[in-house]
């Protein structure tokens, strides 16, 4: 049954509540450092798969990054499912894709509005444990890249998470990271109102986050939500809205990123995967 209230007001815990629940897990388990197999490694990035009863492109994406020997990690930028009761289908499809015995890889998830609305937050945290975290990827020579994942699923980061972002980036200033990438669902900029009431942050919050990221040398911000690609340069920082990849899309893409001395990226069509 469609929860119409949730489409407008949301029925999930608000961001500060989600932060506190996630903090319990983070405090107990800490954050992850992954080992890259090469200096110039690959990250596969997708968003807005909106999994329902079909998971064709979702499973294709999983199989593709698992078979790439240069990829230690993939990132899903949110709206992994479309509506209520599809987390089981999503996870069953994920588990059904064979592992590659020759490599280790990890899927990192970002919470999207479709993932948490309609009372779905308990399901999201059941599978993904936390809505905010960072992870580090270390190359064979010891160079380290920082990926900061934060929750913007209902169009705001909240006061507690904003403070965590400040503290994390202040800590990062002292760590000599090669690159810093922020990963979230809601985008800073848009050319249309296609996503309605969940479109993006307030202007004040946009300015605060952009200033924070610029101050601490964030190289890129990856987001989804709008279902169409947009690339905006803000001084030295590149903000990318990645295309959606749901099965019904006519122009679906994922982003293939090479993390080296500079960050290169391209977009790969999966329109033929049906």
Identify the function of each model-found stretch.
Residues 2-4:
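Beta-strand-rich modules
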Residues 212-225:
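Functionally important transmembrane alpha-helices
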Residues 267-274:
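Short, solvent-exposed aromatic-acidic interface loops
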Residues 8-30, 85-178, 199-200, 205-214, ...:
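Extended active-site neighborhood of metal-dependent phosphoesterases/phosphodiesterases
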Residues 43, 74, 147, 180-181:
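Hydrophobic beta-strand anchors of alpha/beta hydrolase catalytic cores
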Residues 8-88:
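N-terminal active-site segment of His-dependent metallophosphoesterases
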């Amino acid at each position: 049954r469609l929860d119409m209230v949730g489409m407008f007001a949301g029925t999930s815990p608000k961001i500060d509540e989600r932060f506190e629940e996630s903090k319990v897990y983070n405090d107990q388990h800490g954050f992850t450092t992954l080992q890259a197999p090469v200096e110039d490694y690959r990250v596969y990035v997708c968003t807005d798969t909106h999994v329902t009863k079909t998971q064709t492109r979702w499973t294709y994406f999983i199989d593709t990054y698992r078979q790439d020997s240069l990829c230690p990690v993939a990132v899903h930028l949110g709206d992994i499912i479309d509506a209520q009761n599809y987390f089981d289908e999503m996870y069953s499809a994920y588990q059904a894709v064979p592992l590659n015995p020759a490599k280790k890889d990890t899927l990192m998830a970002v919470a999207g509005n479709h993932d948490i609305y309609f009372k779905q937050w308990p399901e999201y945290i059941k599978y993904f444990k936390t809505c905010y975290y960072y992870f580090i990827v270390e190359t064979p020579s010891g160079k380290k890249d920082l990926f900061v994942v934060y929750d913007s699923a209902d169009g705001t980061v909240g006061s507690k998470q904003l403070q965590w972002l400040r503290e994390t980036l202040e800590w990062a200033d002292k760590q000599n990271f090669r690159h810093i990438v922020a990963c979230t669902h809601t985008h800073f900029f848009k050319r249309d109102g296609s996503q309605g009431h969940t479109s993006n942050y307030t202007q004040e919050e946009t300015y605060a986050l952009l200033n924070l990221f610029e101050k601490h040398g964030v190289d890129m911000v990856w987001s989804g939500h709008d279902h169409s690609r947009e690339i905006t340069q803000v001084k030295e920082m590149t903000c990318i809205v990645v295309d959606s990849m749901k099965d019904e899309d006519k122009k679906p893409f994922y982003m293939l990123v090479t993390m080296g001395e500079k960050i290169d990226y391209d977009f790969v069509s999966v329109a033929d995967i049906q």
